């Protein structure tokens, strides 16, 4: 029986945390509004979730991944701003 993948925050968050941690240079680039940073991170997020799901993501799933990845980046930005 195939494993069902559910794109919920509980499932996505550990995956996306790994994307943030593994691509800190691009996260800094995103914070600096460097061209291409968001696209790179969005692509890495979709790729990581697709690998975990074991299949291509549906359009709505990709949009959920992008939205949650953006949320993660906003959390990083807010923490950096609060520290300064």
Regions found by a protein language model. Give the residues of each.
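N-terminal non-cleavable signal-anchor helices
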Residues: 20-21, 66, 77, 81
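N-terminal acidic leader/helix
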Residues: 2-47
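Short intrinsically disordered terminal tails
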Residues: 1-4, 80-84
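Short, charge-rich amphipathic interface segments used for partner binding and complex assembly
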Residues: 40-75
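Short alpha-helical "patches" and their helix-cap loops
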Residues: 7, 60-64, 84
């Amino acid at each position: 029986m195939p494993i069902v993948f559910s794109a919920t925050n509980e499932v996505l968050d550990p995956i996306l945390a790994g994307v943030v941690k593994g691509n800190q240079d691009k996260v800094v680039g995103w914070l600096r509004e460097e061209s291409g940073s968001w696209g790179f991170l969005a692509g890495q997020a979709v790729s990581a979730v697709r690998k975990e799901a074991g299949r291509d993501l549906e359009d709505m799933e990709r949009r959920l991944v992008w939205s949650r990845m953006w949320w993660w980046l906003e959390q990083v930005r807010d923490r950096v701003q609060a520290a300064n």
